[in-house]
Amino acid sequence: MEQFEAISIEQAHSRWQEGGVVVDIRDPQSFAAAHVPGATHLTNETLSDFVRGADFEAPVMVICYHGISSRNAAQYLISLGFDSVYSIDGGFEAWQNRYPQDTQAQA
């Protein structure tokens, strides 16, 4: 995969239920208030640790606020050598509206 693929909320939810990796690039306050359970909060500060411990062959789904910023982040992960990276269309706002039961606040 040389470029990320944009996927729908439904596709992302299905892949998440199958154990797919979700990285959330929103600001710390938004992430703390609510996020996809099991998501990694990916920031400039946590990126190197994430990359160091990552399975580059495992699919990675990037979520942001509305599905715009995640596109750049997804392409960046591709440039780092990740094989399969997806940008979630609609972002966390759409996820929370469609799957309110599948969100959690930071403990």
Swiss-Prot record:
It catalyses: thiosulfate + hydrogen cyanide = thiocyanate + sulfite + 2 H(+); thiosulfate + [thioredoxin]-dithiol = [thioredoxin]-disulfide + hydrogen sulfide + sulfite + 2 H(+). GO terms for biological process: glycerol metabolic process. Its EC number is 2.8.1.1. GO terms for cellular component: cytoplasm. InterPro entries: GlpE_sulfurtransferase, Rhodanese-like_dom, Rhodanese-like_dom_sf, Thiosulf_sulfurTrfase, Thiosulphate_STrfase_CS. Transmembrane segments: none annotated. Residues 16-104 form the Rhodanese domain. Gene3D superfamilies: Rhodanese-like domain. Belongs to the GlpE family. Transferase that catalyzes the transfer of sulfur from thiosulfate to thiophilic acceptors such as cyanide or dithiols. May function in a CysM-independent thiosulfate assimilation pathway by catalyzing the conversion of thiosulfate to sulfite, which can then be used for L-cysteine biosynthesis. This is Thiosulfate sulfurtransferase GlpE. It comes from Pectobacterium carotovorum subsp. carotovorum (strain PC1). The gene is glpE.
